């Protein structure tokens, strides 16, 4: 318990978006940041347990701040933060894929969204060894190194087949268009071709003879 408290206090001493917001609230209210953080975590947990739209709130927590931090990482000259957030998005995508198949069962558990939110916060925690880095090093990276050759071959084969199929469809469409265009014949339009012919035709009409 003391180790967890020390980690929380160390996190609150760092400079990031969360601590900046807590610092501004501390300056206005006079309440210490650790109490504000504890109150915010308690309110968030209660809302995830009993509030409406817990799934949407969880997804926003797992997406909004990481997206903001990723944009800052792209714009910064350092590449270390790029690696950190790329690792997070890999783990986030795999977690979303696993959740797609298990959400119908897990969403019935009362503490599911609280656990999901805690997991996402652990994965994005601004510390040298957060949940995303831990899962990547222990699970994702070994699987990738073991199977990336076969995956690359499958992807290359699928991309080649897709290009061949697209080329065949394009060729067939062009052939159909060419055949339909060749089958159209011009239709002659009836009517006088010149004004002179239009003037001569009434005079050629036979007149009745006088008896």
UniProtKB/Swiss-Prot annotation:
InterPro entries: TB2_DP1_HVA22. It comes from the Eukaryota. It holds the Pfam family TB2_DP1_HVA22. Residues 202-211 have a biased composition (Polar residues). This is Receptor expression-enhancing protein 6. Interacts with STX3. Interacts with clathrin. It is linked to Retinitis pigmentosa 77: A form of retinitis pigmentosa, a retinal dystrophy belonging to the group of pigmentary retinopathies. Retinitis pigmentosa is characterized by retinal pigment deposits visible on fundus examination and primary loss of rod photoreceptor cells followed by secondary loss of cone photoreceptors. Patients typically have night vision blindness and loss of midperipheral visual field. As their condition progresses, they lose their far peripheral visual field and eventually central vision as well. RP77 inheritance is autosomal recessive. Changing residue 135 to P: In RP77; decreased protein levels; does not affect localization to endoplasmic reticulum; loss of rod photoreceptor function shown by a mouse knockin model of the mutation. Belongs to the DP1 family. Required for correct function and survival of retinal photoreceptors. Required for retinal development. In rod photoreceptors, facilitates stability and/or trafficking of guanylate cyclases and is required to maintain endoplasmic reticulum and mitochondrial homeostasis. May play a role in clathrin-coated intracellular vesicle trafficking of proteins from the endoplasmic reticulum to the retinal rod plasma membrane. One of its GO terms (biological process) is detection of light stimulus involved in visual perception. It is found in: Endoplasmic reticulum membrane; Cytoplasmic vesicle, Clathrin-coated vesicle membrane. The lineage of its organism: Eukaryota, Metazoa, Chordata, Craniata, Vertebrata. Expressed in circumvallate papillae and testis. Expressed in the retina. Isoform 1 is predominantly present in mature optic cups. Isoform 1 expression is confined to the cell body and inner segment of developing rod photoreceptor cells.
